[in-house]
Regions:
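A detector for short, charged/polar N-terminal pre-domain segments
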Residues: 1-2
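Short basic helix-loop element that most often maps to the first helix and adjoining turn
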Residues: 7-20, 81
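Residues in the recognition helix of alpha-helical DNA-binding motifs
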Residues: 10, 24, 35
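Recognition helix of helix-turn-helix/homeodomain-like DNA-binding domains
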Residues: 27-44
């Protein structure tokens, strides 16, 4: 499940405002604001989190899970080069 810090970081990496994420995901701006205020794992509807994650992934964000090698995070995928 996404962490609120990952959502804020993904928006920053893309240069998105909360309104941009709302438009891309179909999730209301007030809901995004509430989710981002949380300090821990998200406690919202699963469908809401799936829509947010899908919008970021469509924009090129790759989420990294917490594991034995390190904490959670994210990165921006490389753009495919035309040959």
């Amino acid at each position: 499940m996404l962490e609120s810090a990952q959502i804020r970081a993904a928006r920053a990496l893309l240069g998105w405002r909360q309104q941009d994420l709302s438009k891309a995901s179909g999730v209301g701006t007030a809901t995004i604001r509430r989710i981002e205020k949380s300090d821990w794992a998200m406690t919202g509807y699963v469908s809401t989190m799936v829509r947010i994650q899908a919008a970021f992934e469509e924009a090129g964000i790759q989420f990294i899970d917490d594991d034995e090698n390190g904490g959670y995070g994210l990165r921006l995928a490389k753009k495919k080069r035309k040959r």
